[in-house]
Design a protein with these regions (language model features):
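Short beta-strand edge/turn micro-motifs at domain boundaries
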Residues: 22-24, 119-155
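Short, low-complexity N-terminal intrinsically disordered segments enriched in polar/charged residues
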Residues: 19-49, 57, 61
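Solvent-exposed coil/turn segments that connect beta secondary-structure elements
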Residues: 61, 90, 107-111, 129-133, ...
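Sec-dependent bacterial lipoprotein signal peptides
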Residues: 1-18
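Hydrophobic pocket/interface hotspot
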Residues: 43, 55, 69, 128
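Surface-exposed, charged secondary-structure patches
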Residues: 75-127
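A short gly/proline-enriched turn/hairpin at secondary-structure junctions
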Residues: 56-71
């Protein structure tokens, strides 16, 4: 009985030691996804604080019609006193391909309030395309979440 118990204990210790292998560094895809998430958080934070330069630092110089996008965002910052922008991180998919850009699809919602108290609510599902090397926003596929519904035609 004692031999059996000792044998079981030794087997348990051997398996425990084998399970405690060395830590492996995160794979490149995980590092890229973390960079994209960090950029998204930075975009959302700068947008809510209405910090145009910080916001545009996270947008690639290759973004289509970047100057018009910047002017549109500046107009929104001027028009609305309070902006609340929420990303639903639990409903997100990040696709990373070694040879192309990475794409992050997520749900979002926002509230834009004017000085007069009028509130515009909007939300939806959108895909952001990121440069895998620098994790900067290259393009938006779908409705632009940074332009509220009533302003969509005035970009």
């Amino acid at each position: 009985m004692n031999r059996t118990l000792a044998f079981v204990a030794i087997i348990f210790i051997v398996f425990s030691a084998a399970a405690c292998g060395k830590k492996t560094p995160p794979q490149q895809a995980a590092v890229q996804a973390q960079g994209a998430l960090s950029t998204l958080r930075g975009l959302a934070g700068a947008y809510e604080k209405k910090q145009l330069s910080s916001f545009m630092d996270k947008v690639s110089n290759d973004y289509p019609d970047r100057q018009a996008f910047s002017q549109s965002i500046a107009g929104i910052f001027t028009k609305y006193d309070t902006i609340r922008f929420t990303v639903q991180y639990t409903k997100m998919i990040i696709m990373i391909d070694e040879r192309t850009n990475m794409k992050m699809t997520f749900n979002w919602d926002g509230d834009w309030q004017t000085a007069g108290g009028r509130i515009v609510k909007d939300g939806g599902r959108v895909s952001f395309v990121y440069d895998p090397k620098g994790a900067v926003l290259l393009s938006i596929e779908g409705k632009n979440p940074f332009v509220p519904k009533e302003s969509q035609g005035k970009q």
